[in-house]
Every structure is written in structure tokens, then in C-alpha cells.
Amino acid sequence: MSSLEDRDPYALFAEWLEEAGTTEPNDPNAMALATCTPEGRPSLRMVLLKGVIAQADAEGGFIFYTNLESRKGGELLANPHAALCFHWKSLRRQVRVEGPVVAVSDAEADAYFASRHRDSRIGAWASMQSRPLQGRFELERRVAQFAARYAVGAVPRPPHWSGFRVVPEVIEFWHDRPFRLHDRVVYRSEGSGWTHSRLYP
């Protein structure tokens, strides 16, 4: 195992993610995303990491996409802070990220949306994410409706669909060790660089 200390945390994360791609049965880029209402009520769900900008400033971060009218979208717009957790059981490793959240640009959202499978683009129009659904048939009816609407030509990005970038103030690396004497190293952003320290397990 490479050292956890005196590293660029983005580079270390990239190494771990690449290794997870060879050992995890599926979705090594899956991450738990925690959001919170302005009143302090948290919620948590799994999403997929779709990009990393490896800069130790406000322009860097971990990117994901979502329906802005979903619960997580609403919470992020009202309280733009989040935490992420990657857990790779096959490697006995975990990475936690904490920081403010900023919206991606329309150009970034358009480019990623255009790269998705056509059926997924139709689904983004059909799904009123996080709102009550009477039954599966209702969802399938909406899918058919939007598939017919966009039967010819490109499927545009819905105005309620975009992405966010979590700008890390904290990145913590955890590696399992025997007898629960695990390795924990936390990096904190400071200006254009990082400081790091070890934590008791």
C-alpha cells in the first residue's frame, strides 16, 4: 500500500478509485451523498461520481448529476453543503469528502447529458423524482409520452436536470488494519494547497 501521507489527495484518490475498478463487482464510482435541510435534517443516498477536477482551490471537486427537483436537489439548493463517502469493501478502504457545493455550468451539464444513453435521457424527462407515484404504469406511460415527443432528433437536457460539484475542504482516507488499529489520514484545504494529519482509529 502506498503511503497515505505527504500526497496530493486527488492523486491518491485517483489511485484508489482505479484499483477499486479492478476489484469491486460493480460501480466503483458509487458514493453515499449526504445532504441536509436548512433546519438540520439530514438525508442520504447513493449516487455515481461522474468526474473529478483535481485542483486544490474552489475550482476543484467531485461531480455528480441529478434532478434539481428531487429531495437532494432541493436540499443542495437550499443548503449548499454536502458530504460524500466511498467505501470499497474489496479493498477495505474508505474515503470521506466534506465541503461546499456549487452548480456545474450549463455547458458541463449539456455535455454530460448528451453522453448518456438515449433511454436515460428520456427517463430524465419522464421521472418526477422524489414525488409520489401511483404505480409503475404511470411511470411507463410518461416514458412512452416523452419517447414519442422526442422520437426524432436529439433529446435536450431538461431545465430541472443538472449537476453539482462538491468542493472538498476535507478529504479523509481510511484503510483497514488488524485489530481495528486502522490508518486514518485527513487532508484539509488551505489556500492553494493541503495540510494533513493522522487521526486515531
From Swiss-Prot:
GO BP, one annotated term: pyridoxine biosynthetic process
Binding residue positions for FMN: 45-50, 65-66, 71-72, 94, 129-130, 174, 184
Alphabetical list of SUPFAM superfamilies matching this protein: FMN-binding split barrel
Pathway: Cofactor metabolism; pyridoxal 5'-phosphate salvage; pyridoxal 5'-phosphate from pyridoxamine 5'-phosphate: step 1/1; Cofactor metabolism; pyridoxal 5'-phosphate salvage; pyridoxal 5'-phosphate from pyridoxine 5'-phosphate: step 1/1
A matching Pfam family: PNP_phzG_C
The enzyme's E.C. designation: 1.4.3.5
Record's protein name: Pyridoxine/pyridoxamine 5'-phosphate oxidase
Organism expressing this protein natively: Rhodospirillum rubrum (strain ATCC 11170 / ATH 1.1.1 / DSM 467 / LMG 4362 / NCIMB 8255 / S1)
